[in-house]
């Protein structure tokens, strides 16, 4: 794209949506591949054991190997370099070990249970870990969810799991044993096991990307003066699936009384509106105004389209047309900053990040990054400008990078998914005027679909060729 190419608000057809897509389970072959990837990385970096923590909010690394999270309890999964696996679970998750995708020895630790539940079979965590045996381990990785990336501290010595667990591991190891944060083995952009997805995993995650974008379009189409935030919030949640972000349906002044959730507040003409929903595999987010045309904008924001929405949309188009497999994340970051200067538009987060079970897993796109963008990575387009005196703008959606081999695998193994991808591609190219490269496969139905005026439901920003 020529960055100076003309952008106009134009009447277009609504994007395709798909309402009856069934979830895709991860296959046994995929789960075996996941375990092998982690074991290979353990060998490469000389780890004897990994101790992986999980709770409801921080369970993705645990779930990557086991297939489940311990919901309202805590849990530990211990993986030895030999492949030996152990589960340490509370009262209400003992049954889950027999359903786990990777089998292992079960240890009951009732202190992982909810307060005041029975403490039968109580045994110290030190004792359980001693039974698993770390006595000969020279290097142990503790993994919660977060990979720390401080420029001032030793990231390997910062742990995001409860202190009593860290202390128990220290107590049962030899003095010489090295204990480090090893989350990078899972989510590090350079080589983390979870950063690259096969065809089965992309099909698995596309379910959530399709669901979030389908729900988003339903909510956008329901925007009317007088509609309540809670009504839109209900449309954003679908099929009983657990969100991986807080659902947002917020109009006018946000965060009143520190509230984060949709309320009974009604939409008014001229108000700002933010909508967000997300599931495993992708988030959809929109921000704009409850108006039909620029004439209905607040007097001091009549140029919102020219000052805010169009420059943002141009950058989304540039992002899609210029991201490449094999480029450094730092190179792409620099390209985005050149066409959408931080100094002018005041964005400060990464202009794109990896997506998986969690909405933001990690990002190879940061200043001077030498992490390579690879086939199989699933990305969220995530650029958040802050322009003083103006309402916000957003069109966050999900894509994957796929080389020819991966595209052929998806086509052959999941032809219905490939059909959806092709319909989305056609829409992006022919309705929105974007030259979408073959290696960029849209997992969301609303990639680059931006309606800045919510009451004008037929007009979106497009590229004029």
Predicted regions and their residues:
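Active-site neighborhoods and metal-handling regions in enzymes and metal-associated proteins
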Residues: 1-465
């Amino acid at each position: 794209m020529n960055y100076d190419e003309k952008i106009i608000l134009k009447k277009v057809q609504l994007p395709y949506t798909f309402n009856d897509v069934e979830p895709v389970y991860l296959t046994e072959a995929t789960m075996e591949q996941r375990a092998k990837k982690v074991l290979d990385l353990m060998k490469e970096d000389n780890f004897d054991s990994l101790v992986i923590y999980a709770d409801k909010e921080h369970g993705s690394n645990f779930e990557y190997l086991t297939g489940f999270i311990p919901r309202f309890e805590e849990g530990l999964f211990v993986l030895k370099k030999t492949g030996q696996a152990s589960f340490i679970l509370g009262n209400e998750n003992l049954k889950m070990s027999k359903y786990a995708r990777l089998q292992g020895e079960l240890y009951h630790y009732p202190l992982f249970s909810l307060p005041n539940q029975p403490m039968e079979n109580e045994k110290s965590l030190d004792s359980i870990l001693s039974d698993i045996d770390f006595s000969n381990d020279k290097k142990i990785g503790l993994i919660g969810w977060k990979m720390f990336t401080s420029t001032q501290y030793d990231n390997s010595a910062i742990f995001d799991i409860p202190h009593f667990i860290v202390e128990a591991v220290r107590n049962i190891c030899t003095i010489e044993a090295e204990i480090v944060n090893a989350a990078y083995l899972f989510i590090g952009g350079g080589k983390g096991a979870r950063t690259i997805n096969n065809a089965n995993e992309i099909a698995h995650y596309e379910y959530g990307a399709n669901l979030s974008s389908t729900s988003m379009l339903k909510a956008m189409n329901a925007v009317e003066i007088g509609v309540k935030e809670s009504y839109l919030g209900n449309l954003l949640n679908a099929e009983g699936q657990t969100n991986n972000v807080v659902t947002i349906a917020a109009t006018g002044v946000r965060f009143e009384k520190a509230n984060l959730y949709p309320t009974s507040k009604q939409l008014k003409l001229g108000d700002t509106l933010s909508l967000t929903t997300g599931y495993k595999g992708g988030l959809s987010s929109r921000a704009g105004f409850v108006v039909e045309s620029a004439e209905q904008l607040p007097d001091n924001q009549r140029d919102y389209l020219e000052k805010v929405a169009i420059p943002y949309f141009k950058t989304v188009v540039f992002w899609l047309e210029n991201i490449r497999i094999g480029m450094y994340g730092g190179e792409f970051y620099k390209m985005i900053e050149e066409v959408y200067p931080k100094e002018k538009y005041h964005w400060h987060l990464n202009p794109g990040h990896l997506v998986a079970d969690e909405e933001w897993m990690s990002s190879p796109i940061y200043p001077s990054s030498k992490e390579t963008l690879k086939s199989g990575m699933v990305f969220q387009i995530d650029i958040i400008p802050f322009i003083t005196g103006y309402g916000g703008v957003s069109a966050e959606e999900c894509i994957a990078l796929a080389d020819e081999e991966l595209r052929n695998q998806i086509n052959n193994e999941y032809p219905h998914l490939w059909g959806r991808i092709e319909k989305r591609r056609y829409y992006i190219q022919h309705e929105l005027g974007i030259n979408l490269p073959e290696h960029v496969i849209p997992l969301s139905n609303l990639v680059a679909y931006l309606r800045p005026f919510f009451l004008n439901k037929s007009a979106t920003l497009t590229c004029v060729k």
